[in-house]
Amino acid sequence: MVDVEELMSKIKSGVWSTQDAFDCIKDLEQEYLQSSKTKEWREDYSLAAYFTSYGIFACSYRECVFPMIELCQKLLEDCPNSADQALYYLALMRLYFVTGFQPKIVEYGLKYVETGYADRMNLKSTYNSIVVAFTENDLFEEALYYLEKMIDVTRNDPAAEGVDFWNGDTINEIVYLDSLV
């Protein structure tokens, strides 16, 4: 069984390895097989699946991506609630980001946003990923739209007090995307 606290600690400390990722996937798959039969899921199973996918994303362990994508898609089919569903969509978006397959990045990113369970930090990250996907495909008008959404989320974030929206990087990105529209 994947221990969420231990998993998060390994990822943060930088000792997370490809073998750790494969071990987590194997453990999650075994637990999935048992839970899908009984329809009883442990409370933090979705977090364990999410943080496993986050570790794969953060470390770009490409060889682990497809087994984890397959597991997340199975989990969506048996998803016990929408909060868990949101985590699986976010996991899939990040896994597809590792592969560079932009249509799926946008698809799962938007599904995550539509669940209504998106938190601010992940919402900003999701919009940023969508901006990158559209920019990579020369869809600058769409990229600008989601960049503005990302800025709105940050602007309305009480924890982001003191954020300067007029710094060089933000202005350059807006001007660049706007000039391509």
Range-by-range predicted roles:
Residues 141-158:
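TPR/TPR-like (Sel1-like) alpha-helical repeat modules
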Residues 1-13, 37-58, 82-94, 124-132, ...:
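Amphipathic alpha-helical repeat scaffolds of TPR domains
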Residues 52-61, 80-103, 107-118:
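Alpha-helical adaptor scaffolds
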